[in-house]
Amino acid sequence: MVTLRKRTLKVLTFLVLFIFLTSFFLNYSHTMVATTWFPKQMVLELSENLKRLIKHRPCTCTHCIGQRKLSAWFDERFNQTMQPLLTAQNALLEDDTYRWWLRLQREKKPNNLNDTIKELFRVVPGNVDPMLEKRSVGCRRCAVVGNSGNLRESSYGPEIDSHDFVLRMNKAPTAGFEADVGTKTTHHLVYPESFRELGDNVSMILVPFKTIDLEWVVSAITTGTISHTYIPVPAKIRVKQDKILIYHPAFIKYVFDNWLQGHGRYPSTGILSVIFSMHVCDEVDLYGFGADSKGNWHHYWENNPSAGAFRKTGVHDADFESNVTATLASINKIRIFKGR
């Protein structure tokens, strides 16, 4: 009798589990695509759904960026469905996004964007989103390292290097400043005019502000024919093709609309890095943002503390961007390390 009860319990448990999983996957599939009742197609769909389930499992950090209903201000701005990287599957821009993007640097007679993107993905892998494919840890900790002079004598280097991802931007040298800025870089955000040579294992994230930026990256790893945009740019770069990622133009507009509320002409690389990291990381720490303790705005590699022309260009609203990051820190979505 006891054996029969155990067997019955096992059968019931199996049936409940089977019904639950079947219901879950069918409902999930229905939200994505219409279900096709061919065995091979079903297996593929179940496999893809299982991958998505694993990728998007709950964060295990103490404070998880994506957690909602903790701040109305944050919930109004953060859109988890936005895709930060351009791929062959999501490359079609809506008309209003395309028109807005074209105005950023007022490019004269740009080439056809669709043709440019097709050529881009003949050279750069564009069939998957590498950042999301790598999402295999319960708590991904990321350091976003800005270029502020407040990093000098901060001794943040080892702390920065302890993160899973370390994002840097533009010129950002590390040689000679290792104790303060660290040695590790996993992703480096650049545009053609700010490019610097990267380490072999560093992923380059190109931030395109105009069509020629996309053409440049193709040229720079193939023919080397583009050596000038509005200023001279490197004709050739040494970056592995599978290490080249493209920041999505629609994501730039999302940052501008949702987070900057239209302040400035367009977002700085700094705030683009911050919001990008919030969408691919579970925990984000900022280093090298803002002025130093004396109120000076300068780069950590500059010997002139009073420098800060980059803040006075009128292109970016540095004060508003600073307020955004300060607010994010105040509601425990990110942490800011202010250095010296």
From Swiss-Prot:
Q: Where in the cell is it found?
A: Golgi apparatus, Golgi stack membrane; Golgi apparatus, trans-Golgi network membrane; Secreted
| Result when mutating C142S | Loss of the catalytic activity
Tissue expression summary: Expressed in several tissues. Highest expression in lung, liver, skeletal muscle, kidney, pancreas, spleen and placenta.
InterPro entries linked = Beta-gal_alpha2-3_sialyltrans, Glyco_trans_29, GT29-like_sf, Sialyl_trans
Residue ranges annotated as Lumenal topological domain? 35-340
* A single cellular component GO annotation: Golgi medial cisterna membrane
Is the keyword Disulfide bond assigned to this protein? yes
Known catalytic reactions = a beta-D-galactosyl-(1->3)-N-acetyl-alpha-D-galactosaminyl derivative + CMP-N-acetyl-beta-neuraminate = an N-acetyl-alpha-neuraminyl-(2->3)-beta-D-galactosyl-(1->3)-N-acetyl-alpha-D-galactosaminyl derivative + CMP + H(+); a ganglioside GM1 + CMP-N-acetyl-beta-neuraminate = a ganglioside GD1a + CMP + H(+); a ganglioside GM1 (d18:1(4E)) + CMP-N-acetyl-beta-neuraminate = a ganglioside GD1a (d18:1(4E)) + CMP + H(+); ganglioside GM1 (d18:1(4E)/18:0) + CMP-N-acetyl-beta-neuraminate = ganglioside GD1a (18:1(4E)/18:0) + CMP + H(+)
Cytoplasmic compartment: which residues? 1-13
In this protein, the residues bearing a glycan are N79, N114, N201, N323
What is the membrane topology listed in the Swiss-Prot or TrEMBL record? Answer: Single-pass type II membrane protein
Quick one: effect of changing V315Y?
Answer: Drastic decrease of the catalytic efficiency for both donor and acceptor substrates by 67- and 344-fold, respectively. Does not change the enzyme regioselectivity
Out of the domains of life, which is the source?
A: Eukaryota
GO biological process terms held by the UniProt record: ganglioside biosynthetic process via lactosylceramide; keratan sulfate proteoglycan biosynthetic process; memory B cell differentiation; N-acetylneuraminate metabolic process; negative regulation of activated CD8-positive, alpha-beta T cell apoptotic process; O-glycan processing; protein glycosylation; protein modification process
Query: Could you tell me the keywords of this UniProt record?
Result: Disulfide bond, Glycoprotein, Glycosyltransferase, Golgi apparatus, Lipid metabolism, Membrane, Secreted, Signal-anchor, Transferase, Transmembrane, Transmembrane helix
Q: Could you tell me what this protein does?
A: A beta-galactoside alpha2->3 sialyltransferase involved in terminal sialylation of glycoproteins and glycolipids. Catalyzes the transfer of sialic acid (N-acetyl-neuraminic acid; Neu5Ac) from the nucleotide sugar donor CMP-Neu5Ac onto acceptor Galbeta-(1->3)-GalNAc-terminated glycoconjugates through an alpha2-3 linkage. Adds sialic acid to the core 1 O-glycan, Galbeta-(1->3)-GalNAc-O-Ser/Thr, which is a major structure of mucin-type O-glycans.
What is the protein's given name? CMP-N-acetylneuraminate-beta-galactosamide-alpha-2,3-sialyltransferase 1
